[in-house]
Amino acid sequence: MNCKKLSKALLFLITALVIVSCSKDDCDLDHIDKLQGLPALKAGTFPEEDLTLNVGEQYVYAPKASSPLDIYYQWYQNGEDMSTDPSFTFNAEHPSRSKVILELSNDLGKVTLEHKVMVPGADYSKGCLIINEGWFGHGSGSISFYNYEKNSIEHWCYKNQNFGDVLGVTSQSATLWNGKLYVCSKEDNQLVVMDPKTLYAENSCGKLANYQAYEFIGLNDDYGVITHGGYF
């Protein structure tokens, strides 16, 4: 079989796989037409590789998209609603690790693009950390930092250093043990282990069975216990 025949065979196989993989209930020719009508991004107009900036620098996102219908833009940074303009400027105001999300949508659906921006230099060693339990039913716990030298407070430190990731619900305590910081929350992301200087997350355990987590107590280099409702 020559290359031309092989290409036709592969194209037929791919088309067949797409049609076969669609269920009768949620995927038909109309669905394929909708996919073809979604906003299309022009190659090279949205970064594909992670970006590193220094404090004080900025980066301008200026994607070029096309669609037979009107296109709507929605920008998020670490989960926060930032802009609905076609372009977006990321300002590296302080050290952080951020996830920028662009949603391109029209009446047929939505296309989502993600990009990570690193601004190195996080240092939370010259002050104290404040564990906020959060507003139950509305949001997760968080970490704030009081800077002794600047006499200022920075909020949402953990979230801003971990690409928008959040602690669990109703955060209770933070324990410094063997050079790591262990933060306990009652629900969801119940134990998060991080570097105490940068607050970069290194590990997490998600949900601990059906128990609430209150405090971590280190025993040795290999083991520790977590209190829950008066028990270990």
Language-model features and meaning:
Residues 2-9, 13-51, 108-128:
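Bacterial Sec-dependent N-terminal signal peptides
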Residues 52-65:
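A short beta-strand segment in extracellular, disulfide-stabilized domains
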Residues 72-92:
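Surface-exposed, flexible coil segments in extracellular/virion-facing regions
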Residues 128-138, 176, 183-187, 218, ...:
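Conserved beta-strand positions in repeat-built beta-propeller and related beta-rich domains
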Residues 148-150, 195-199:
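Short loop/turn segments that connect beta-strands within beta-propeller blades
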Residues 157-167, 204-209:
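Surface loop/turn motifs at the tips and blade-to-blade linkers of beta-strand repeat domains
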Residues 166-173, 210-221:
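Repeated scaffold domains used in trafficking and secretory/extracellular systems
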